[in-house]
């Protein structure tokens, strides 16, 4: 935990929110049925990311410059939680605000540095809306059209993005991490958006979940960022207090988008989760499922972040 004389990440974010006079944005997530909250992992920080091994092959190097072979149907994406991004709807405008902050940190003057194009989306516990957020952030940027996006399912739990999009029988992230010689291009799935591709979690998640904390997975994630420097790589990762995966992957990414469910997630849960991922240089907090009255206008919405 942080020393008494040093404000916690969430306290710094709250101070910024109050100072700016803003109200956190409310994104209406389609929550999945509840699951039990697993006990928090040990409070110890994950070890520093080891340097890449010179002899290890680049697991993303074999990806061909061709379009993905399979396409996800738009209706299936909508059923999986894709919101209407057209027009001036509140949710579309809110995701445009979120994407502006993420893209500025990734490619703009406020770049977060190395691997800033790698964005991990997570939360404290299940059903706070992280998968909804990851899917709609990726789609919002793809609709904009000036940046390519790779949406990666890095959650080995059942009910993940791959399940929602009908990709649970497809090879993906886990297979590539286990076998760097596997062609990444074979695993990429196309979408109705020309600039958006999806990498499923893979078929081995039932018995290869340990790969998320392995050096091969960390090398793979960073290789994706190094190879696709012109695109944003959005990783939908399991909740911090359900598994140690986010703590391990936080050292490999340049940004974390941390989803907090309004009026439900406890402060101590948020603090415990943030302590586990503070190895990432830039952490953005997004308050989700806020109940707004009809008198609120779009201009009152914002979100807090800490870095």
Language-model segments: residues:
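A short, flexible beta-alpha/helix-coil linker loop
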Residues: 126, 158, 203-206
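Phosphate-binding loop that captures ATP/GTP phosphates
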Residues: 140-201
């Amino acid at each position: 935990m942080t020393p008494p004389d040093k404000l916690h990440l969430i306290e710094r974010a709250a101070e910024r929110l109050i100072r700016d006079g803003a109200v956190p944005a409310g994104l209406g997530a389609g929550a999945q049925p509840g699951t039990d909250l697993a006990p928090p992992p040990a409070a110890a920080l994950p070890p520093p990311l080891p340097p890449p091994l010179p002899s290890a092959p680049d697991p993303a190097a074999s990806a061909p410059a061709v379009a993905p072979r399979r396409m996800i149907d738009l209706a299936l994406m909508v059923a999986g939680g894709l919101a209407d991004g057209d027009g001036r709807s509140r949710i579309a405008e809110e995701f445009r605000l979120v994407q502006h902050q993420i893209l500025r940190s990734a490619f703009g003057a406020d770049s977060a540095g190395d691997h800033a194009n790698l964005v991990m989306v997570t939360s404290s516990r299940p059903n706070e809306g992280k998968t909804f957020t990851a899917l709609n952030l990726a789609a919002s940027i793809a609709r904009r059209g000036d940046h390519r996006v790779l949406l990666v399912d890095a959650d080995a739990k059942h009910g993940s993005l791959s399940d929602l999009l009908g990709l649970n029988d497809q090879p993906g992230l886990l297979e590539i991490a286990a076998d760097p010689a596997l062609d990444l291009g074979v695993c990429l799935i196309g979408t109705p958006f020309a600039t958006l591709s999806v990498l499923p979690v893979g078929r081995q998640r039932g018995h290869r979940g340990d790969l998320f904390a392995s050096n091969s997975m960390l090398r793979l994630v960073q290789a994706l960022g190094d190879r696709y420097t012109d695109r944003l790589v959005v990783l939908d990762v399991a909740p911090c207090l359900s598994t140690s995966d986010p703590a391990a992957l936080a050292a490999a990414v340049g940004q974390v988008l941390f989803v907090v469910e309004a009026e439900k997630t406890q402060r101590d849960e948020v603090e415990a989760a943030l302590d586990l991922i503070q190895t990432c240089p830039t952490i953005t907090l997004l308050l989700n499922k806020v109940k707004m009255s009809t008198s609120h206008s779009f201009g009152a919405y914002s979100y807090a972040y800490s870095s």
